[in-house]
Amino acid sequence: MSKHSLIENLKKQIEPIAEGLDYELYHIEFVKEGKENYLRIYIDSENGVSLEGCEKVSRAVSELLDDIDPIQESYYLEVSSPGIDRVLYTDKHLQKYKGYNIVLNLYSPIDKKKKYEGELVDFNENEINIKVEENIVTIPREKISKTTLKGEL
């Protein structure tokens, strides 16, 4: 099974578990760091994410993973909040944070810049529009390597 198929399969099975515990499944990733593999599950809710919430989701997901055993190699399971400087992966995430400040990291420079920061004004399937100072800047989505919420306390 490909990594993408694994993640999609896990999303379908973990999403109802998270929702049953009053959390939204924000993102899943399976990564190798050094010699270790990590299955990272990010959860969110309107009221924030507590350590106890992460523990509950972790226990429930761990039971599921023990039952279905989808990953042949050894790995560590991590459940956490996406954090204040969260990556915005989907259109749903972008929609939620319209009006907030974001950071766009680019694969290659546009106007000699590889990083743009500004208020998320709008987006569509092809581009993201941000307000930088008083100007609207349009960045093609295929040029964007990473979109991050600019965490502000």
UniProtKB/Swiss-Prot annotation:
Biological processes annotated in GO: ribosomal small subunit assembly; translation
One Pfam entry name: DUF150_C
Superkingdom as given in the UniProt entry: Bacteria
InterPro entries documented for this protein: Ribosome_maturation_RimP (IPR003728), RimP_C (IPR028998), RimP_C_sf (IPR036847), RimP_N (IPR028989), RimP_N_sf (IPR035956)
Subcellular location: Cytoplasm
HAMAP family: RimP (MF_01077)
Name this polypeptide is given: Ribosome maturation factor RimP
Species whose genome carries this gene: Clostridium botulinum (strain Okra / Type B1)
Gene from which this protein is expressed: rimP
